[in-house]
Amino acid sequence: MQKASTSAGAKTAGNRKMQKSPNNGAAKAQKSAKTVDTVTDSELLYNPPAFLTAAEKERRKYLQARVRAEGESASTSSKSNATRPTDRKRHLQAEDPLPADANNNDTNKGGKVAQESASTQAAGTTKRKQPRSQGLEQTSPIMVNGEALACPLVRKSLPAAEAAKSCPLPSKKDSVTKSPMTVHEAPKVDSATSNSNEKQLATMPVDIHKTDSIEEGRRVLEWLINPVAVNQFFADFWENNACVVQRKNPNYYSKLMSFKMIDDILMRNRVEFGTNLDVTIYRNGKRETLNPEGRAFPSVVWDFYAEGCSIRILNPSTYLLGLRQVCSIMQEFFHCLVGANVYLTPPNSQGFAPHYDDIEAFVIQVEGRKRWRLYEPPEKADQLSRTSSGNYDQKQLGEPIIDEVLEAGDLLYFPRGTVHQAITEKGHFSLHITLSVYQQQAYANLLETLMPIVLKKAVKKSVALRRGLPLHTFHVLGEVQRTNRCESRDQLVENVQKLVSKYLMPSTQDIDEAVDQLAKKFQHEALPPIILPEEKVRTVFGSRSISDQEGNSVCDYEFDTDTSVRLLRANILRLVNEDDGSVKIYHHVNNALEYCKYEPNFLEILQEEAIAVEVLISAYPYYITVDQLPLKTVARKVEVATALWEHGLLMTEKPFK
């Protein structure tokens, strides 16, 4: 196996330490001296004092043991007693206040999941049905001992969101007339239940280099859809029903994006119209795209915005580290590319015509507010559609199944094939992010890859499939001949059906091969991993060569049989046996931030070396020593481990220096 040179240009993300909030600091200043001197659990974990009492040392050991525990789920202990809903009219709200999150939100200033009171509902509309309690299980943000440690992302990566002076943040939500819909509420949680549930909540990992990337992706999804439990989300909503989460917590997603960040992106980067940014408007019942040619300078973009046009950034994760981290971590959980678009809409405007998409959509309202209306797919064949639709006219749409206003901190999920449109209200702009998941991930995509494989193998094995068609085939089969009922036609149809049933049943090996091809496609599409500081010192991304007195290059690493290694991520590579007999490792370590900008990255290895990669895949997330690689010689074991590490695919348990 040939060694690779050290990868250049690898960027690192911030660490996972807590940031101190000005709000939290002010709150602490108002406490008594006794309260100030008390060391919190968060401080014990991440910023312990120089001198600890015996009790504090024991408490710190206990907390460290808790956060290291693997397999801890974020679900609550109580089960939902409600039956599974069958309609698509979903609206999740919770009543109890949640602790402050990573965005430094004060619990006394809107750190709650929003719930409309009965009086507000009555004032909004008399048509709306009274809510029915569904008995949803409630989860909380990432916590330790009741303190929310935050959005599970790298801190210090982005500044706090700021609203543009011309577009102040909207006031509190006022009454909005809505279509009648069933509201499913989260039940109140008493203090006893809340305390018991805290033991099961996911916590901020301490040993970053030992975490499971799939579980990290699940943890980010949990934060995204909180207070809906992940298991409940997949049981009740995923690919079936829309879900609305309202929080009255405008800062919940503020670390990801802001109005000001858009201006910074335009100023600091060469953003191209049509490639990176679209200017759209919906007027007279039609959507118009108004992209000029060339670079999207800030002054030009804001002129369009001032005229009522919507701004869509097509690849925001290229420019925003925090958003990129959300996408790159979630793609580990979903095993597919997680894309993102940013939409900025001026007041009293609509940028897009009603349509449906071919993705599972998570709409994250970051700033402002926007009214969303969702409709059933026009045709049954449009449900879970594999392609996006054209634009619909308002006359083609029926009554909306959901008509809701999203405010900053709210979230809306809806399945692919759901017709939707959104409009801002007078006096209120909107900034939201749409995360797109599960595009072209259906069984149909697997079968499209699988059946050619099956047919190719069957043709080689079966003479019957290679025999020529009868001479009269064109005269008895075809669209024109469909009303022609004759014995020869029926016999030909029966022959084709028998050939399919006899020779085209896929084997397990065929299915494995097809799935490998889909996974290879994911490696080409995926975002590159963000390497954290704890990972950088254990990977090639932190390696630096030096020169000795004679000018020779000296590496700062050296593998031996006792070196412990593991894969960088659970899905960082795919081992594929190609048709020509070669064995290749496809990976996304060096992928571009732009979609499929480069050709797929791969390493070609020897057939006898594949078993070593298989062992590494099976061992993840645990470390194994180089000596445990099932290769014949020690030299080959060290060579293979070194080569994989030099390509950025492996991480050592301990830094070399």
UniProtKB/Swiss-Prot annotation:
Binds 1 Fe(2+) ion per subunit. One of its GO terms (biological process) is negative regulation of DNA-templated transcription. The modification Phosphothreonine is found at residue 139. Residues 1-141, 165-198 are annotated as: Disordered. Signal peptide: none annotated. It is found in: Nucleus. Its EC number is 1.14.11.-, 1.14.11.27. Transmembrane segments: none annotated. GO terms for molecular function: 2-oxoglutarate-dependent dioxygenase activity; histone H3K36 demethylase activity; histone H3K36me/H3K36me2 demethylase activity; histone H3K4me/H3K4me2/H3K4me3 demethylase activity; iron ion binding. Keywords: Chromatin regulator, Dioxygenase, Iron, Metal-binding, Nucleus, Oxidoreductase, Phosphoprotein, Repressor, Transcription, Transcription regulation. It catalyses: N(6),N(6)-dimethyl-L-lysyl(36)-[histone H3] + 2 2-oxoglutarate + 2 O2 = L-lysyl(36)-[histone H3] + 2 formaldehyde + 2 succinate + 2 CO2. Residues 315-454 form the JmjC domain. Fe cation binds at residues 355, 357, 420. The keyword Glycosyltransferase does not apply. Residues 55-71 have a biased composition (Basic and acidic residues). Pfam families: JmjC_2, RIOX1_C_WH. Residues 32-41, 73-84, 132-141 have a biased composition (Polar residues). InterPro entries: JmjC_dom (IPR003347), NO66-like (IPR039994), RIOX1/NO66-like_C_WH (IPR049043). Its cofactor is Fe(2+). SMART domains: JmjC. Belongs to the ROX family. NO66 subfamily. Oxygenase that can act as both a histone lysine demethylase and a ribosomal histidine hydroxylase. Specifically demethylates 'Lys-4' (H3K4me) and 'Lys-36' (H3K36me) of histone H3, thereby playing a central role in histone code. This is Bifunctional lysine-specific demethylase and histidyl-hydroxylase NO66. It comes from Drosophila erecta.
